[in-house]
Design a protein with these regions (language model features):
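Short, well-ordered amphipathic alpha-helical segments that serve as non-catalytic structural scaffolds
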Residues: 36-51, 97
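Phosphate/pyrophosphate-binding loops at sites that engage ATP/ADP/AMP, CoA/4′-phosphopantetheine
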Residues: 44-60, 146-151
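Oxyanion-binding and handling regions
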Residues: 1-23, 35-38, 92-215
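Generic structural marker for isolated residues within well-ordered, non-membrane alpha-helices
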Residues: 44, 80, 159
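Short amphipathic
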Residues: 25-29
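Residues at secondary-structure transition points
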Residues: 31-39, 70, 74, 78, ...
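DPxDG-like acidic metal-binding loop motif
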Residues: 60-91
């Protein structure tokens, strides 16, 4: 098994997984909103010390590139790129959708992330894991269509605003992160430059464009 250090900073929670000599070391914080930049490095350092490992011993680094919090995504990417630059080891970019759909072979899955205001980031996969809906910004009506077509709803988040008529499985974030790293790292083509997956413009960008258009 490869040694790796992976982080998911794309949501309110923080997940860091270190795999070293076949053993996993995990830190999971349910509510880390707005503190990822302060928490990530100390957590990574603590796990490395606990395992008696060093960054140079990692075979690769992984980060979640979206969808999710714009700020959180940037923090995770910058950290992984920094580790990669310091060690010369590759980066494995992951998406929140792949994490939500991990171990879902044989099922049709609609992976969801909360986009606020009653909207969701979504990506659908068929029984073989192929995308049937690329990363999109959708509402409850679109979700219902997928449910009626036999799709299972999954998320790494607790979707508190999702209506009760929808049943959404929440996968364990740390397990999804670790299992996705171990499966996807088997294919060298999955490694590369981590590029943020922004499905829609940030609120700040939208406001700037609106102000510019009003001039």
């Amino acid at each position: 098994m490869k040694n790796y250090l992976a982080a998911d900073t794309a949501s309110k929670y923080l997940t860091v997984v270190l795999s070293y000599n076949g053993k996993r070391y995990v830190c999971y914080e349910e509510d880390c909103a707005m503190r990822h930049s302060a928490e990530l490095m100390p957590v990574a350092d603590r796990l490395l010390k606990e395992a008696g490992a060093s960054l140079s011993e990692m075979d690769f680094f992984a980060c979640v590139v979206g969808a999710g919090s714009f700020t959180g995504i940037r923090i995770g990417i910058a950290t992984a790129k920094g580790f990669s630059l310091a060690t010369g080891k590759p980066v494995l970019p992951l998406t929140s959708f792949r994490l939500a759909a991990y171990n879902g072979e044989g099922k049709k899955i609609l992976a969801l992330c909360d986009a606020l205001h009653g909207k969701y980031y979504a990506c659908a996969f068929d029984e073989t894991g192929l995308e049937t809906l690329p990363p999109s910004y959708i509402g409850q009506e679109e979700i219902l269509r997928f449910v009626n077509d036999g799709y299972i709803l999954r998320s790494t988040e607790r979707l508190e605003n999702l209506p009760d008529r929808f049943s959404c499985e929440r996968v364990t974030p740390s397990e999804a992160l670790a299992e996705s790293c171990e499966k996807l790292s088997e294919d060298p083509s999955n490694f590369g430059e981590p590029i943020a997956l922004y499905i829609r413009k940030s609120q700040a960008e939208t406001e700037r464009e609106q102000k510019a258009a009003a001039k």
